[in-house]
A protein has these predicted regions:
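Nucleotide-state-sensitive switch-loop elements of NTP-binding domains
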Residues: 1-111, 115-122
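Phosphate/Mg2+-binding loops and adjacent switch elements
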Residues: 84-171
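OB-fold and OB-like single-stranded nucleic-acid-recognition modules
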Residues: 138-239
C-alpha cells in the first residue's frame, strides 16, 4: 500500500468528526505529506479550517453515493497527490459497496474504525441492524462513546464479537475510556452448569481466574485450547 486509507464508519452523529478532529492534531498521527480528507456526510460538528491547514489536510466532499466512484477518487489522487487518505463514510451507505470498489493505484485500506453512540446503539440495532452489521463485519476497532456505567456494555461487546471476532471494542464516557467494565459482570454465564468461554473472551476469563481463583472453585469451565505433550512426560500428563 503506497497511499493508506483510514476508513471511518458510523451512523450520523456517532462521533466520527469529533474523533477525527482530535486525531488529526495528535503528534502520533503527524505526517510530512498531504492528507486527503473525504467527507461523505455532514453532521452538526464541523472541521476547523485552521486546524486542517496547520496539518496539511485538504477536504473533498461527496454528497451522493452515485458520485462516490473510482473515477472521482482517481481525479482526487491526481489533483492532490496525497500521502494518505481519510474517508468519513456515510452511515447509510453499505461499507460492502466500498469494499467492492476498484481503488486508485497504490491506495489500500490501512485501518477501519467504527464509531457508535452508546446512547442510541440499541435503537439502531432494532431498526437498522443489517446496515450496522455490514458496517462492522470487517472493522478493526469499534469505539462506543457517550456510554454510562449502567449500560449493558458486556452485551454490546458480545454483539460486536459475534459479527467480528477480531475487532477491538472500546467504551468511552464523557471523561474518556472506561476501564474494568467487566469487573462486576463477566461476558459469560458464571452460574451455568458449564461455563462456556468464547475464544474472544478467553483473555478476560484468564485474568479473572488468576486474580479470583475462588470464583471458579468446583466449577466446570469449557474453552478451546491446544494440548501439548512434551517428551519424557508420563502418559497421564499433558500441558
Amino acid at each position: 500500500i503506497k497511499v493508506p486509507i483510514y476508513l471511518m464508519t458510523g451512523f450520523l452523529e456517532s462521533g466520527k468528526t469529533s474523533f477525527l478532529n482530535f486525531t488529526i492534531q495528535q503528534d502520533y498521527f503527524h505526517t510530512d505529506g498531504k492528507t486527503l480528507l473525504i467527507l461523505c456526510e455532514e453532521g452538526e460538528e464541523e472541521y476547523d479550517p485552521a486546524i486542517l491547514e496547520a496539518n496539511n489536510t485538504v477536504v473533498e466532499i461527496v454528497e451522493n453515493e452515485e458520485d462516490f466512484t473510482t473515477d472521482r477518487l482517481v481525479a482526487m489522487d491526481i489533483l492532490h497527490q496525497p500521502e494518505r487518505v481519510i474517508i468519513e463514510y456515510n452511515g447509510m451507505w453499505l461499507v460492502s459497496n466500498f469494499e467492492k470498489m476498484q481503488l486508485p493505484k497504490g491506495w489500500g485500506v490501512e485501518q477501519q474504525i467504527t464509531c457508535v453512540d452508546g446512547s442510541t446503539f440499541q435503537m439502531y440495532m432494532a431498526n437498522m441492524k443489517s446496515i450496522f452489521m455490514d458496517m462492522i463485519k470487517n472493522t478493526d476497532m469499534v469505539i462506543f462513546n457517550r456510554c454510562k456505567q449502567d449500560d449493558p456494555l458486556p452485551t454490546y461487546r458480545r454483539g460486536i464479537k459475534v459479527a467480528n471476532q477480531r475487532a477491538e471494542v472500546i467504551f468511552e464516557d464523557e471523561e474518556g475510556e472506561l476501564d474494568d467494565i467487566f469487573q462486576d459482570e463477566m461476558p459469560f454465564d458464571m452460574d451455568a452448569p458449564v461455563i462456556e468461554i468464547l475464544p474472544e473472551d478467553y483473555g478476560i476469563w484468564f485474568v479473572d481466574a488468576m486474580d479470583h481463583p475462588e470464583n471458579y472453585d468446583g466449577k466446570t469451565v469449557r474453552f478451546k485450547a491446544r494440548v501439548m505433550k512434551p517428551r519424557g512426560m508420563g502418559s497421564k500428563f499433558f500441558v
